Amino acid sequence: MSTTAHTEPSWADLPFLDFTDPNFSWDSPEVAEAREKSWIARTPLALLVLRYAEADQLARDKRLISGFRGLVDMVGTPEGPVRDFMVDFLQSLDGADHRRLRGLATHPFTPRRITAVQPFVRSTVEQLIDKLPQGDFDFVQHFPHPLPALVMCQLLGFPLEDYDTVGRLSIETNLGLALSNDQDILVKVEQGLGRMFDYLVAAIEKRKVEPGDDLTSDIVRAFHDGVLDDYELRTLVATVLVAGYETTNHQLALAMYDFAQHPDQWMKIKENPELAPQAVEEVLRWSPTLPVTATRVAAEDFEVNGVRIPTGTPVFMCAHVAHRDPRVFADADRFDITVKREAPSIAFGGGPHFCLGTALARLELTEAVAALATRLDPPQIAGEITWRHELGVAGPDALPLRFGAA
C-alpha cells in the first residue's frame, strides 16, 4: 500500500490519518476536518472511507472483496494455528466457499429462531438485573459478559452452566482477529484456540450421536450430508460463537458508557420504554463497537468520485466517522435517542459480509436497555475504565458503574 500511495496521482491531496497511533481518537478535530476535506483518507494500512454515502455504497460494491486475509499478511501474522484460523474465518472468505458456509451459519439468526429466542433473552435480562450487586461494581462482568454468552449457549445447544467458559474462550479467540503480531498475544490466542476447539469438538461429537434443535446439530447434519468437512465444521461453529458474543458484549458496555454521559436520555427511556429500539439505533450510530466496520480489497481497478482504486488496494469503511457525517445526520454530534434518524446504522457492514448476528444483537441490546432503564436509575461511572483499542472490536473491557439517584 505504501508504494501505491506514493505513485497514485489521485491520492496526492487526500488527508492522512494514522489510526494505528495509540493516542489516535476517532472523535478528534483532525478526523472531522479530514471528513470535510475528502470522502476518503490515506492511512498506514488502507484507504479509509469517512463519509456515510460512500461507505454505505462501497461496503456492498462487488468490485471489493473481503480484505481480511490480506490484512493478516499485512500485519505479518506468522504461520501457525492463529494464522490458519484467521484466514479460514468466515469473514476472510469470498465466492462459492463463503456462500456455502455462510448459508449454514445463518441458521441461528433466521427470523424464526430470533422470535423463538426472544423469551429466553428477556427472562435472562431480568435475572441478570436481579443479581446485580449494590453499590459500585464492574458492569461488564455482571451483565455484558453473561448475557450474550448465555444466549449463544442456548442457540448452539451448549449447557447454560458453561456460559462463563464459552464467553472467555470467545474473548481469547477474538484477540486473534485484532490482527496483532505481538508474540505474547499470539501465544495467548493459540492457547485459547486450543481450548476453544477442545470444547467444540466435544460438543460436536455429542451432537453427532444425539442431535437436537440447535445450530450445532444443524451444522452436524450438513457434515453428514457431505456439505462440509471436519475442519470446516468446528471452524464454522467457532465463527458463529465469536460473532454472536464479542461485539454484543462490548456494544452493551458502550451503551452504558453513553448513558452515563447522557443521563437525561436514560430518563426518557424510563418514562417511555417504547423508545428502547430507537435508543439502541442511536447507540449504534454514536459509538459502534466496530469503528472500522468493513475491510475490503479491490478485486479490479476502478474509480469513485475522482479517486482511482487500483487492484489490491485495501479499503476500509469507518462507521464511527461516517455516522457523524453532517451530510446525512442532522445534529450529527449530538446524542439524542428521540431523533428518528433517516439513514440506518452501517455498524454491521454491508454486502455479502453483512454481520450474521445483526438481528440477534439488536434484540439483546433492546431488551437490555429497556429493562435496565425501566428498573434502575441512570448509570454513573464509578472508577477507572479499562478500554480495548484495536483494529477490531473496541470498547470497555472493564466498566465500573453504580446505578445512582435519578
Curated annotation (Swiss-Prot):
The keyword Magnesium does not apply. One of its GO terms (molecular function) is oxidoreductase activity, acting on paired donors, with incorporation or reduction of molecular oxygen. Disruption phenotype: Inactivation of the gene yields a mutant that cannot produce aureothin. The mutant produces luteothin (also called deoxyaureothin), a metabolite that exhibits a significantly improved cytotoxicity against leukemia cells compared to aureothin. Its cofactor is heme b. CDD domains: CYP_AurH-like (cd11038). It catalyses: luteothin + 4 reduced [2Fe-2S]-[ferredoxin] + 2 O2 + 4 H(+) = aureothin + 4 oxidized [2Fe-2S]-[ferredoxin] + 3 H2O. Changing residue 89 to W: Exhibits a change in regioselectivity and is capable of C-9a hydroxylation. Changing residue 239 to F: Exhibits a change in regioselectivity and is capable of C-9a hydroxylation. Its EC number is 1.14.15.37. Heme b binds at residues 98, 102, 296, 350, 353, 355. It comes from the Bacteria. The keyword Oxidoreductase applies. Keywords: Antibiotic biosynthesis, Heme, Iron, Metal-binding, Monooxygenase, Oxidoreductase. Gene3D superfamilies: Cytochrome P450 (1.10.630.10). GO terms for biological process: antibiotic biosynthetic process. InterPro entries: Cyt_P450 (IPR001128), Cyt_P450_B (IPR002397), Cyt_P450_CS (IPR017972), Cyt_P450_sf (IPR036396). Belongs to the cytochrome P450 family. Bifunctional cytochrome P450 protein involved in the biosynthesis of the antibiotic aureothin, a nitroaryl polyketide metabolite with antifungal, cytotoxic and insecticidal activities. Catalyzes the hydroxylation of luteothin (also called deoxyaureothin), leading to the formation of the intermediate (7R)-7-hydroxydeoxyaureothin, followed by the formation of the aureothin tetrahydrofuran ring, the final step in the biosynthesis of aureothin. The hydroxylated intermediate probably changes its conformation in the binding site due to a sterical switch of the enzyme, thus allowing the second oxygenation-heterocyclization step. Monomer. This is Luteothin monooxygenase.
